[in-house]
A protein has these predicted regions:
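A helix-coil-helix interface module used to build multimeric assemblies
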Residues: 1-187, 192-197, 206, 259-262, ...
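Alpha-helical support elements that line or immediately flank enzyme active sites
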Residues: 31-32, 105-117, 226-235, 240, ...
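Amphipathic alpha-helices that form helix-helix packing interfaces
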Residues: 33, 113, 117-120, 124-127, ...
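Residue-level signal for inorganic ion chemistry
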Residues: 38, 320, 371
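A short, charged helix-loop
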Residues: 197-213
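A conserved active-site cap/scaffold subdomain adjacent to cofactor or substrate pockets
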Residues: 218-250, 258-317
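Long, amphipathic alpha-helical stalk/connector segments used for oligomerization, subunit docking
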Residues: 283-366, 374
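C-terminal alpha-helical interaction appendages
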Residues: 333-402, 418, 423-430
Length: 432
């Protein structure tokens, strides 16, 4: 991923220096396992353990000649090992090294993303509890529906990201798998006991039925989980973008002192971070499709997946890492305007209470269809600016006789619509 969207900790996981260091860890772990069986002399093991990680520049130089990055790495590493290098990569194939190293990188990336999700869930929980009683207009199809609270809006996002945590944990388990099984996964030159020992040392499980590679449905599952998390970020960002519209102005993302919103229009305060997060989600969906394309390889393996996942896996992890960090910034610093929320609710002229008026008439003995038609006539007249919904409804034939004005006012009270939402916040308070 380009530096603009790469944060330091995630970038370090996917750096070439880290990859080569993990290459060495995997190779040394195999040599140690063979040494414990008396197959590698102690002096040779020491030489291998003490050898430096090859410099990327040397590996690149060799790769330009050899056109094989793993052989280039092993050659560069062997230069630092000396004669004991004959024990390095013994009985292994390139994918043993590549896939096991990739699993180490992916599990570390997942752990970092899990911490990001924890922070975001916590921020959403706190802001939702802060605004549990902040009344606002609920909208369906972008149109006024019924009263809700801003806390309820945020609670829904908190639970969504909690589900993302569970999906990520499952996907981490799926990719925490390596293989040290040889050219076509038959353990022809290294016994499965060595694989089990090495992978346990590295914190990985073995692929139960390896070919030459770890099955790629594992990586597809991870990319899908990252894409769903990205979609949840997009949903949150889209809500902020709509609420920041000039004619709505119920919430807006932070705008720093000295920040500029437009080269041409000095008045602009645009939701640029929220818009950027929507773009991040689009990238993640593309990477998920790429992961699915990589599942079907020829026979025991081809390398059609290689170029794809060298881009898709690091980029997807970096993109979601960035998106989650920015989403936390957005939530923690979100400027909320309860006054605008109340004003927009009142501007609906009571229309948001139409369902309560309908049920009040039904409770008064009206047939539901007759009640619906009376409420709808009053609502349509209110939409057309012919008066307030409450007064228009009371003018409908028979309504004033069926409903006392205090009872209708109580039914239309916005607070009544959210009075039963307590269990949502009880569940939210338990979210950690």
């Amino acid at each position: 991923m380009i530096p603009r969207y790469t944060l330091p900790e995630m970038g370090a996981i996917w750096s070439e220096a880290t990859r080569f260091r993990l290459f060495v860890e995997v190779e040394v772990a195999v040599v140690r396992a063979r040494a414990r069986r008396g197959l590698v002399p102690a002096d040779d093991l020491a030489a291998i353990e003490d050898a430096p990680v090859p410099a990327p520049e040397r590996v690149h130089l060799l790769d330009a000649e050899l056109h094989h990055d793993v052989i280039a790495f092993l050659t560069a590493y062997g230069e630092g090992v000396g004669e004991a290098a004959r024990h390095v990569h013994y009985g292994m194939t390139s994918s043993d090294l590549l896939d096991t190293t990739l699993a180490l990188q992916l599990t570390r990336a997942c752990d970092l993303l899990a911490r990001r999700l924890d922070r975001l869930v916590g921020a959403l929980r706190d802001r939702a509890l802060e605004h549990r009683d902040t009344l606002c207009l609920g909208r369906t199809h972008g149109v006024a529906a019924e009263p809700t609270t801003f806390g309820l809006k945020l609670a829904g996002h908190a639970f969504a990201f909690d589900r993302d945590r569970r999906r990520l944990a499952a996907a981490r388990d799926a990719v925490a798998v390596g293989t040290i099984s040889g050219a076509v996964g038959t353990y022809a030159n290294l016994p499965a006991e060595i694989e089990a020992e090495v992978l346990k040392e590295l914190g990985l499980a073995p692929e139960p039925a390896p070919t030459q590679v770890v099955a790629r449905d594992r990586h597809a599952e991870l990319l899908a989980a990252l894409a769903v998390a990205g979609a949840d970020v997009e949903r949150l960002a889209t809500e902020v973008r709509h609420l920041q519209r000039t004619e709505v102005r119920e919430a807006e993302e932070p705008f720093a002192e000295g920040q500029k919103g437009s080269s041409a229009m000095p008045h602009k305060r645009n939701p640029i971070v929220a818009e950027r997060l929507v773009g991040m989600a689009r990238l993640l969906r593309g990477y998920a499709v790429a992961g699915l394309e990589d599942v079907a390889l020829w026979h025991e393996r081809d390398i059609s997946h290689s170029a794809v996942e060298r881009v898709a896996l690091p980029d997807a992890c970096c993109v979601l890492d960035y998106a989650l960090e920015r989403a936390h910034w957005l939530v923690a610093g979100l400027r909320v305007s309860p006054e605008r929320m109340r004003a927009n609710l009142e501007a609906s002229g009571g229309l948001a209470g139409s369902s309560a008026a309908l049920l009040a008439l039904v409770d008064a003995g009206w047939a539901r269809e007759n009640a619906y038609l009376a409420v709808q006539r009053a609502a349509m007249a209110a939409w057309e600016g012919k008066g307030g919904f409450r007064d228009l409804l009371l003018a409908e034939p028979g309504v004033a006789e069926a409903l006392a004005v205090p009872d209708l006012d109580a039914a239309l009270d916005p607070a009544r619509f959210v009075a039963g939402a307590g269990p949502v916040f009880e569940r939210l308070e338990a979210l950690r």
